[in-house]
């Protein structure tokens, strides 16, 4: 029934005079009710998505909601260089429906506020913009959407590295000394400039313009006037105030240039180049590396045009890189503040700068680079010792035995105690394994089922995440790792295991922190969900390191967020084992490359896949990829152990393991270099060859460190096409020389079924094969030159106990 008819019937029924004061109140009341109902209906349509539990949030929908108010960045109204602060004027808009030739759409149109009392609010607010000099390649740009700045406890921000906090936040003089930027201004612009780049702030129309040192525009923000020349009325740089609750979220919009390519965003399993994709930066359990979900999203990316951006936030965000409009990067952020770190340079320089802010991966103990043997799961002391015995009996070099979900009294029931009936003497077992060169890793998770022995304690002591009613969000108790009391409790449990002789702890899960939970930090899951893996990684890493002999322990984690690279290492999750298409293997390769382009030096994956028994051919092709990754693990549904498959497969497995152990001096030196510079061990070709246009197109090959190129066989067969950057490349296995460009290479006669090529002019260190890394004979290093046109060969050496890398020339 129409509102007018409802009012008419109501008036007649009550006998109210048409122009009376009562009549005016009735009309006002019913109008408010109508508007409220309309808003609710609109919210249900545009903003009322019912997400599955812990499903990735797509924040873009909030920026097309007709119930919201839109504020468009318009002009700078003042700026103080001494403070690095100014005021940015935002114009108030709404989205207005428009019909043209039977096509319905909506355009942003100017709006006069209806807020009351109207003298107390600004129709077009002036809000703070702040620029900070961080380093000579890094600037920090912060825009606020409220006159009240949100509390930013940066000294305790888990995303920032301790070094960044100490040097850049704690000591302003040190920061300014590093961040040498020349500043200037005129009537139309504000400029920060040095030899590496330019940030130009155009006053009106407001734009943030990034330029290279020569003045070439790299990207810039969009203004409403950019819509004048197009029928597509794209929302420019804006923030919203929601009609539902007045909460705010910001939407920076940047130019996306022809030929531009975007990389990063975490361990993404889709195409490396994110242009054309819509990336949801929300931690999820994607159930494997075959979808667009991510265990390890990272709100950082960079462009082939020479700039990078770190969105300093833990709120969910959606990055639309030309998916909805081919000329724009649309960053739909859940946060109400835009806090961006902007980097200038080539990929290596940008990765170094980004990891200066969020931290670099520390150098890891030598034993971690050896073979990790596992399955889901070994259930007893006897079984673990037998696996170790078989590895040595079959002469397969290995350093780690991992016990997955089955070491507790009840499978999957994490209580931090070895099952007494199946592990008669766990400490003795750990000592026996260590004596034979094996370190031990144990599985655990941060969720506690109602039947877990610790469930009631966690709930009673307030150590689990709670909902608004004070009860649990789920049936399980999820550790609230923003609570120092919980962290202490958790670390005590881990410390007991490390003191017994365990060397590594598997940091499984961590993706299901409730979005609607209330946390001890005082924040909701909107800000804590993505932070959860980082807090989880940190708590476990600290417990393992603090209680390990010589602080040599590590973690083995599945989930991550920006800053988690400080707590290595991570693996690629539960890969599919389907042979046709090798989808799991392809997803892992893309994920590892993308992860490395997001600031993580070390990474692994389950060779052969995880879900079911790996087909023989798939497992064989996966082996070289696994052993030529920074870290190597066989894990998944049994059998993963080669001797349980066949003698021929055992020989193949051994050959791959021996190759890596021979290369361990190379691996160790490259790892050290990566840890110092924020570089990945498994790196996309363009990181090493940024001026080779073809290198930017390749996503099924990688550089293993700086000198070895690896192209796995992603399909059945013995040959494949590869792209080689300019120069000569020498086959690691037979010495054949290849020219740069596209080549079709056969490995039919190779012992290792993989294309492995060495860069011309490389000097590769090798050692005799050892059965474990503690038996490596570092005094017997030989140097193998790979030389075609090069006049000199260069190699790198870093031995355990060394302080720095030594450059060797021959």
Question: What is each residue range found by the language model?
Answer:
Residues 138-139, 189, 198, 207, ...:
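Beta-sheet entry/capping signal
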């Amino acid at each position: 029934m129409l509102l007018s008819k409802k009012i008419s019937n109501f008036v007649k029924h009550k006998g109210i005079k048409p122009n009376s004061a009562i009549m005016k109140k009735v009309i006002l009341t019913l109008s408010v009710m109508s508007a409220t109902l309309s808003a609710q209906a609109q919210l249900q349509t545009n903003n009322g998505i019912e997400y599955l539990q812990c499903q990735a949030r797509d924040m873009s929908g909030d920026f097309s909601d007709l119930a919201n108010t839109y504020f468009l960045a318009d002009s700078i109204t003042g700026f103080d260089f001494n403070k690095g602060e100014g005021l940015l004027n935002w114009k108030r808009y709404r989205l207005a429906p428009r019909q043209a030739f039977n096509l319905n759409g909506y355009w942003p149109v100017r709006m006069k506020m209806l807020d009351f009392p109207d003298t107390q609010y600004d129709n077009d607010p002036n809000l703070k913009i702040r620029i900070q000099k961080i380093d000579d390649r890094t600037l920090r740009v912060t825009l606020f959407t409220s006159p009240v700045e949100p509390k930013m406890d940066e000294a305790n921000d888990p995303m920032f590295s301790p070094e960044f906090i100490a040097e850049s936040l704690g000591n302003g003089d040190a920061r300014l000394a590093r961040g040498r930027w020349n500043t200037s201004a005129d009537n139309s612009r504000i400029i920060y400039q040095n030899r590496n780049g330019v940030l130009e702030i155009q006053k009106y129309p407001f734009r943030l313009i990034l330029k290279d040192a020569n003045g070439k525009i790299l990207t810039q923000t969009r203004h409403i006037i950019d819509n004048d020349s197009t029928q597509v009325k794209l929302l420019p740089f804006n923030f919203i105030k929601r009609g539902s609750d007045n909460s705010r979220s910001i939407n920076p919009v940047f130019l996306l240039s022809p030929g531009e390519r975007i990389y990063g965003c975490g361990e993404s399993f889709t195409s490396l180049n994110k242009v054309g994709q819509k990336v949801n930066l929300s931690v999820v359990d994607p159930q494997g590396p075959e979808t667009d979900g991510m265990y390890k999203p990272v709100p950082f990316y960079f462009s082939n045009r020479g700039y990078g951006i770190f969105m300093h936030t833990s709120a969910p965000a959606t990055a639309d890189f030309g998916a909805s409009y081919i000329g724009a990067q649309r960053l739909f952020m859940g946060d109400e503040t835009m806090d961006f770190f902007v980097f200038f340079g080539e990929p290596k320089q940008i990765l170094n700068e980004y990891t200066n802010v969020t931290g670099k991966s520390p150098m890891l103990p030598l034993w971690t680079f050896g073979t990790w043997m596992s399955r889901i799961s070994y259930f007893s002391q006897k079984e673990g010792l037998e696996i170790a015995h078989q590895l040595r009996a079959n002469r397969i070099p290995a350093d780690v035995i991992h016990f997955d979900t089955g070491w507790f009294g009840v499978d999957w029931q994490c209580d931090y105690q070895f099952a007494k009936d199946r592990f008669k003497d766990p400490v003795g077992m750990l000592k026996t394994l260590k004596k034979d060169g094996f370190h031990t890793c144990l599985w655990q998770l941060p969720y506690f089922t109602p039947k877990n022995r610790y469930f009631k304690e966690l709930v009673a002591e307030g150590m689990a995440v709670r909902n608004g009613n004070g009860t649990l969000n789920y049936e399980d108790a999820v550790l609230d790792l923003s609570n120092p009391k919980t962290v202490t409790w958790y670390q005590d449990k881990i410390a007991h295991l490390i003191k017994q002789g365990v060397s590594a702890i598997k940091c499984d899960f961590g993706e299901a922190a409730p979005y609607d939970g209330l946390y001890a930090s005082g924040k909701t899951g909107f800000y804590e969900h993505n932070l959860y893996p980082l807090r989880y990684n940190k708590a476990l890493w600290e417990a393992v390191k603090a209680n390990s002999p010589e602080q040599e322990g590590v973690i083995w984690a599945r989930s991550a967020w920006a800053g988690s690279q400080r707590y290595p290492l991570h693996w690629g999750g539960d890969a599919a084992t389907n042979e046709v298409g090798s989808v799991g293997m392809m997803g892992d390769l893309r994920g590892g490359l993308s992860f490395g382009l997001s600031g993580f030096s070390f990474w692994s994956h389950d060779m052969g896949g995880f879900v079911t028994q790996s087909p023989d051919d798939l497992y064989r092709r996966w082996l070289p990829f696994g052993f030529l990754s920074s870290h190597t693990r066989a894990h998944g549904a049994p059998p993963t152990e080669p001797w349980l498959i066949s003698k021929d497969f055992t020989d193949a497995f051994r050959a791959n393991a021996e190759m890596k152990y021979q290369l361990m001096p190379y691996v160790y030196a490259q790892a050290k270099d990566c840890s110092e510079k924020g570089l990945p061990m498994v790196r996309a070709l363009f990181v090493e060859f940024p001026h080779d246009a073809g290198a930017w197109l390749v996503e099924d090959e990688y550089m293993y460190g700086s000198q070895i190129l690896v192209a796995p066989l992603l399909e059945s067969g013995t040959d494949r096409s590869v792209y080689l950057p300019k120069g000569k490349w020498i086959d690691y296995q037979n010495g054949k020389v290849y020219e740069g460009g596209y080549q079709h290479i056969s490995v039919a006669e190779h012992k290792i079924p993989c294309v492995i090529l060495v860069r011309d002019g490389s000097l590769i260190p090798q050692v005799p094969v050892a059965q474990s890394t503690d038996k490596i004979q570092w005094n017997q290093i030989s140097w193998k030159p790979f030389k075609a046109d090069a006049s000199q060969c260069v190699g790198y050496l870093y031995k355990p106990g060394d302080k720095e890398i030594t450059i060797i020339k021959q």
